[in-house]
Structures are given as structure tokens and as C-alpha cells.
Amino acid sequence: MGRPLFYDIIEKPATSCIVTLCSVIWFVIQKKSIGYSQVGLSYETAIEGHYWRMITSALSHISVLHLVFNMSALWSLGVVEQLGHVGLGTAYYLHYTLVLVVFSGVLVIGIYHLLIARFKIDYFRRVTAVGYSCVVFGWMTILSVKQPSSKLNLFGLLSLPISFAPFESLIFTSIIVPQASFLGHLSGILVGYAISWGLIGGMNNYWALTMLGWIVVVFVFSLKKSGAYDFSFLEIESLTDASLPSVRFIGNGRTLQASAVPLSGVEVV
């Protein structure tokens, strides 16, 4: 008999929570027939101030195959949580997962901007990205630098040397998921290398909590401003300096605006 799953869950608590969260979100999206245009990230929605999509797009998946591939790879990469003795571990995993979600999202929008503004490729203006692959590819890259002898197991059947996994998985994903976003995956790889080489570093509990706090604030206020969710207990008033919002609590409304109409140009990441 193999090792009971229970022990892996105990040793990979953060990974287990993320896999569960992404799976539940996928189920809700399917059950509620929520359109991916409502949760995905695109250049147009980013410049309109829908910053909350940077989080929802990362946690949402377009198909069960996409979900299974990402979660299978993520589960294997959860070995990072078991490597506290070499400077990794659960805290490191949580700290830099935050970094990967935010920085890879910002980077992919930056690349879209360059392609649109400099090279006049308007196709990328409306491409909508969804999926956790940016983070998955980022962790593949980090592990390939810090633990090059490790293996990446996919679906419990395929085992890849971690040193080549980011690029092998890039090819494999393109084959099984034709809509896979090359730029989204590349963004995760680049941020992963930046973390591995110390270009992005210094994360500790204080900075992680500070970053998480700002993520929550930006998420809530951008969600309110975009009108995607009716936080009627929050009201943003205009001041002389419009960059400094005033907040009032005036009621309690919870109205989710969701559409089942899909958006053309969806890319999975």
C-alpha cells in the first residue's frame, strides 16, 4: 500500500488549502454558470481599474482538464513545504505564493501593454487570462534552481526532472490545452527566476501580512469601484485629492453580478 493521503495533507497544509480553494471555485463557476469574462484578467479590464481580477483570475479555471493539470503539478510542488531544513518550508511557500500571484499578474499586463503600445498588436487588448499556471510555473522555476535533483509528478503517472520542468510543462500544456497562454506561463517563469536569484526577496511574516493587507484593500475597493459587487455598506466619496478615498458604512448589501456569457479570446494560465 502507498502512503496514506492524510500524511501528505498534514505535511502540505498550504498546498492542500490552495488545491481545495481552486477546486471549490471551479465547482461554483460551473454550478452558477459564471462567465469567465466575469473573473478573468485582461488588459482592458486592468486599465479600467478591475485590479481584483488579478486574484480571481489566478484562482479560476476554464475546464476540468486545466484544473487537474494545475492542481496535480501544484500538489507535487508542495514538497517546498517539506524543505524547511534548506531554507524553504510552509512560511516561505506562503510568502512567495503571494509574490508570484501579484508580480506575475502585473508582469503579464506589462507585456500586453508593450505589445499593444509599441508593436500595435491589439489582439492582446481583449485577451482574458484565467488559471493558476503563473504560480505553478513560478514554483517549478524556484524548485528547479534551489532543488535541481527533485522530480515533478503529473497526474501520478508522468515524472519530469524539475530542472527542465518549466519548459517541458510549457510544451506539454500547449499540447493538452490549446488555449494555454504562453505569455502567462512565461511571466510565472520570469518571476520565479527573479525570486530564485534574489532579485525579489526579503519576504518575512511582517512584509507578507503587509502585502496581504494591501491586496485585501485594493481588492475590495476596486471591486466596489468596478460595480462587480454591491458593497452598499461602503461608499467612496470624492475629495479634493481623488486618490484619497473616504469610507462610510451606510448599509449592508450583497449582490453578485455574474454573467454566463463567455468572452472570446480566453487564454488559460
Swiss-Prot record:
Chief location: membrane
Membrane topology: Multi-pass membrane protein
A Pfam family recorded for this sequence: Rhomboid
EC annotation from Swiss-Prot or TrEMBL: 3.4.21.-
Gene Ontology CC terms, in alphabetical order: membrane
SUPFAM superfamilies xrefs: Rhomboid-like
Domain of life: Eukaryota
InterPro entries: Peptidase_S54_rhomboid_dom (IPR022764), Rhomboid-like_sf (IPR035952), Rhomboid_protease_S54 (IPR050925)
The keyword Transit peptide belongs to this UniProt entry's keyword annotation: no
Transmembrane annotation, as ranges: 9-29, 60-80, 97-117, 127-147, 157-177, 182-202, 203-223
One GO biological process term: proteolysis
MF GO annotations: serine-type endopeptidase activity
Localization per Swiss-Prot or TrEMBL: Membrane
Record keywords: Hydrolase, Membrane, Protease, Transmembrane, Transmembrane helix
Key word Protease present: yes
Record: active site: S133 (nucleophile), H185 (charge relay system)
Family per record: Belongs to the peptidase S54 family.
Function noted in UniProt: Probable rhomboid-type serine protease that catalyzes intramembrane proteolysis.
UniProt-recorded name of the protein: RHOMBOID-like protein 13
Species this protein is from: Arabidopsis thaliana (Mouse-ear cress)
Upper lineage: Eukaryota, Viridiplantae, Streptophyta, Embryophyta, Tracheophyta
UniProt gene name: RBL13
